[in-house]
Amino acid sequence: MGNSLLRENRRQQNTQEMPWNVRMQSPKQRTSRCWDHHIAEGCFCLPWKKILIFEKRQDSQNENERMSSTPIQDNVDQTYSEELCYTLINHRVLCTRPSGNSAEEYYENVPCKAERPRESLGGTETEYSLLHMPSTDPRHARSPEDEYELLMPHRISSHFLQQPRPLMAPSETQFSHL
């Protein structure tokens, strides 16, 4: 009984850490939310964020077997690799209404082999970092909903659209960590 309560508490903590109730959303909504919690088609907030979720999924049979056994052994041996890429967002373009179904068409992915992204257009662009962390577990099927997370520089403010700022050097930019 104690083991079951411990596991339930862990599951509740994991659920609470996931932003915006992603378990209840469709895969399209899960990858199309902005920082202000709006759906992509109806919002022009910056920047867009693709949510990255790492969750161990086990079938219910394994779950029942582990809950009935006395010792709890959590498998934390999963490892992830990292690949750093860049995205440039032109704020002039994003201030206008998108012509397509999604504002994500305005993103420009720069290959990670490039030393620096292309030159800034007079302070109207902001450099962001995309972190790609696929699972090294061969049983884990790759899906589009767990590919990228857009990391936002620490110093960006809510009135960023009215007051464009110059592009910061990489050493001056602070990124949040997963």
UniProtKB/Swiss-Prot annotation:
GO terms for cellular component: cytoplasm; plasma membrane. Expressed in diffuse large B-cell lymphoma (DLBCL) and several germinal center (GC)-like lymphoma cell lines (at protein level). Highly expressed in normal GC lymphocytes and GC-derived malignancies. Expressed in thymus and spleen. Its main location: cytoplasm. Changing residue 91 to A: Loss of FBXO10-mediated ubiquitination and degradation. Phosphorylation on tyrosine residues can be induced by IL6. Phosphorylation is mediated by LYN. It is found in: Cytoplasm; Cell membrane. InterPro entries: GC_assoc_lym (IPR031364). Keywords: Cell membrane, Cytoplasm, Membrane, Phosphoprotein, Ubl conjugation. One of its GO terms (biological process) is regulation of B cell receptor signaling pathway. The keyword Ubl conjugation applies. The modification Phosphoserine is found at residue 99. It holds the Pfam family HGAL. The modification Phosphotyrosine is found at residue 148. Induction: Up-regulated by IL4/interleukin-4. One of its GO terms (molecular function) is actin binding. Coiled coil: none annotated. The keyword Membrane applies. Involved in the negative regulation of lymphocyte motility. It mediates the migration-inhibitory effects of IL6. Serves as a positive regulator of the RhoA signaling pathway. Enhancement of RhoA activation results in inhibition of lymphocyte and lymphoma cell motility by activation of its downstream effector ROCK. Is a regulator of B-cell receptor signaling, that acts through SYK kinase activation. Interacts with ACTB and MYH2; the interaction with MYH2 is increased by IL6-induced phosphorylation. Interacts (via C-terminus) with ARHGEF11 (via DH domain). Interacts with ARHGEF12. Interacts with SYK; the interaction increases after B-cell receptor stimulation, resulting in enhanced SYK autophosphorylation and activity. This is Germinal center-associated signaling and motility protein. It comes from Homo sapiens (Human). The gene is GCSAM.
